[in-house]
């Protein structure tokens, strides 16, 4: 895999300047207030980063509309650069995504979770934080997160032309003009180890589940959630690509069992069950948890990272005029996150023993 695109480097806090016409801004605000799940595209007057100015991008709302009401003044955006010209890119990217989940009060959850996943060898999107300015005024601090799309696949996979599906409703996200989705049907229909092994990169899936279990994550493939993609790599079969890591760390108690725990109202995790119910699969899963702890979840390293990143974003977080929580909540969330990773690492260590 190639390294992260420059705009997601950990040692920068980029500022993106958006010029949005009054008409478009009022449409976006109405859509946000009404929880409009259609998320239509609107023309963006201009997108500026340092010396780069783009005037033919489009803007739309992003995130899950059912949570928007929790954050009345702080919309979340996707900016698309290739809607009007299919070849257009910004620093090699088709889109940028600005995420601000209501309960990510440290601003660091996705960023830390995805970094851990990349460190242990999971193909996971890149993320840092970014300041967003709207019509000349500071609008807020966001998680700046890489979109899982064809550009992402090109970065990670030797053969990036396979089918990508989003778990939510198994919607096809690449090669959409080809209506054949029999490959994912075969994956969904697999009901024993041999059938699954024929279509899925099981070792990769085990690593992905183990990483989510250690974090822990309450909404991905491991917990019986819907926040992940599957990519049918022509070389290895279906790989699991994690997504949306704001329901991680302090969203869950530090002592959830890395094997048994499952989210309330889960959506099932048939692939996980098939694999971990075989003695060999379970053995590999435990080894993967050990690997994640050793290569990605060293508490002092994570705490140093939290300290470094929180120093980087501190001024931007505190001066964010639209965040739906207080500076005190932000500071508390950082302290809780620091304490949590230590407790979690100790708990998983004991569980392995």
Regions found by a protein language model. Name each.
Residues 1-353:
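Phosphate/dinucleotide-binding and metal-coordinating scaffold of catalytic cores
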């Amino acid at each position: 895999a190639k390294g992260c695109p420059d705009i997601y480097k950990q040692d920068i806090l980029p500022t993106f300047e958006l010029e949005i016409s009054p008409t478009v801004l009022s449409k976006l605000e109405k859509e946000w207030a009404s929880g409009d799940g259609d998320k239509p595209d609107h023309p963006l007057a201009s997108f500026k980063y340092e010396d780069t100015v783009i005037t033919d991008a489009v803007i739309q709302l992003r995130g899950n509309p059912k949570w928007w009401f929790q954050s009345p003044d702080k919309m979340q955006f996707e900016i698309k650069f290739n809607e009007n010209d299919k070849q257009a890119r910004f620093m090699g990217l088709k889109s940028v995504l600005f995420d601000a989940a209501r309960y990510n009060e440290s601003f660091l959850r996705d960023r830390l979770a995805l970094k851990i996943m990349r460190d242990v060898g999971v193909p996971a999107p890149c993320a840092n934080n970014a300041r967003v300015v709207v019509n000349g005024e500071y609008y807020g601090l966001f998680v700046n997160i890489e979109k899982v799309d064809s550009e992402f696949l090109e970065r990670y996979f030797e053969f990036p032309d396979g089918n990508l599906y989003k778990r939510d409703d198994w919607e096809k996200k690449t090669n959409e003009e080809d209506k054949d989705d029999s490959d994912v049907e075969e994956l969904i229909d697999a009901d024993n180890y041999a059938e699954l092994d024929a279509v899925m990169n099981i070792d990769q899936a085990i690593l992905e589940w183990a990483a989510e279990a250690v974090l822990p994550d309450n909404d991905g493939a491991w917990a019986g959630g819907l926040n992940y993609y599957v990519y049918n790599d022509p070389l290895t079969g279906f790989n699991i690509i994690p997504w949306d890591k704001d329901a991680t760390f302090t969203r869950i108690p530090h002592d959830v069992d890395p094997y048994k725990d499952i989210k309330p109202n889960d959506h099932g995790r048939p692939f996980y069950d098939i694999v971990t119910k075989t003695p060999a699969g379970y053995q590999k899963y435990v080894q993967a948890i050990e690997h994640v702890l050793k290569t990605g979840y060293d508490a002092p390293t994570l705490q140093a990272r939290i300290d470094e990143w929180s120093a980087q974003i501190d001024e931007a977080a505190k001066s964010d005029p639209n965040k739906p929580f207080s500076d005190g909540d932000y500071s508390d969330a950082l302290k809780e996150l620091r304490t949590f990773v230590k407790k979690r690492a100790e708990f998983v260590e004991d569980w392995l023993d």
